[in-house]
Regions:
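Chalcogenol-based redox active-site neighborhoods
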Residues: 2, 12-96, 103-105, 110-112, ...
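C-terminal cap of thioredoxin/glutaredoxin-like
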Residues: 3-6, 18-30, 36, 103, ...
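Active-site beta-to-alpha loop of glycosyltransferases that engages the nucleotide-sugar donor
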Residues: 9
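Short Asp/Glu-rich motifs
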Residues: 44-46, 97-98, 161-162, 199
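A C-terminal junction/extension of Radical SAM enzymes
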Residues: 96-97, 239
Length: 246
């Protein structure tokens, strides 16, 4: 099974949805290839000096009570997934460089290292309340997950000239976002299972388990049947078709 999903480190439901997905796979005793694609909820957000969640919700027109309710809903969903959320104090910051660093890490250290870094980025944003647009923060967080911070620093400092690795990876982030638009993705998280089943939004663990069971059962049936369909067979009671010979 392959699950492709668009995600942003500034999206609380992305962290919750991905965590519940991984928990569901573990509960089912199954594995899947997980491919993350970059998405920016606020591409024009400042690298540093952004506002926390509460005033941003008020600026969107929510009342005081509605903003409190929105924050409480996220915190409770996070707690149910075992995540230490404090959504109200999260500081909005630009995530473009965080996406670039993740792709750099995946290219040089593998997908497991990139997934570990993603988890650290989410935790930093929603629990530690640091600014992911700050290159010093990105280097430190990478170092905490075992990635040489000096390599990350050199990558972030490199000019985005045509043909350079820094430019190629930056273009890959933009390509992910263009693919999202062409696919019809307008919000995250957004999951596509085996290239045909779309899951827009975060599910709880039970919701993931119910859906994944059906897809895995379908995979098992197809694996047993193969691509050839049913042919002519014979059994104890005879053959399904008799071929007359003259």
């Amino acid at each position: 099974m392959k699950i492709t999903f668009w995600s942003d480190f500034a999206c609380p439901w992305c962290w919750i949805g991905e965590t519940n997905l991984e928990a569901a796979l573990k509960s089912l005793g199954r594995t899947a290839e997980l491919e993350m694609k970059a998405y920016e909820l606020a591409p024009n957000a400042p690298r540093m000096g952004g506002e926390t969640t509460f005033p941003r919700l008020l600026a969107r027109g929510l009342s005081w009570e509605e903003a409190e309710g929105r924050i409480k809903e996220v915190d409770e969903a996070g707690a149910a997934a075992g995540l230490p959320f404090a959504y109200g104090d999260a500081i909005q910051s630009n995530t473009f460089d965080a996406h670039r660093v993740r792709k750099f890490v995946e290219a040089h250290f593998g997908r497991d290292a990139a997934e570990k870094l993603s988890e650290r980025f989410f935790r930093a944003y929603f629990s530690d309340h640091v600014e992911l647009g700050n290159p010093e923060v990105l280097c430190r967080l990478a170092g905490e997950t075992g990635i040489p911070s000096g390599q990350v620093r050199a990558f972030l400092d490199a000019p985005l000239d045509t043909g350079t690795e820094a430019r190629i990876i930056a273009d890959a982030v933009r390509e992910d976002e263009m693919t999202a638009r062409s696919t019809g993705v307008t919000s995250v998280p957004f999951f596509i299972i085996n290239g045909k089943y779309s899951v827009p939004g975060a599910l709880d663990q039970a919701g993931w388990e119910d859906g994944l069971k059906q897809v895995f059962e379908e995979e098992d049936r197809e694996r047993q049947r193969g691509p050839f369909g049913a042919g002519v067979t014979c059994g104890p009671d005879g053959c399904s078709i008799d071929f007359d010979r003259e």
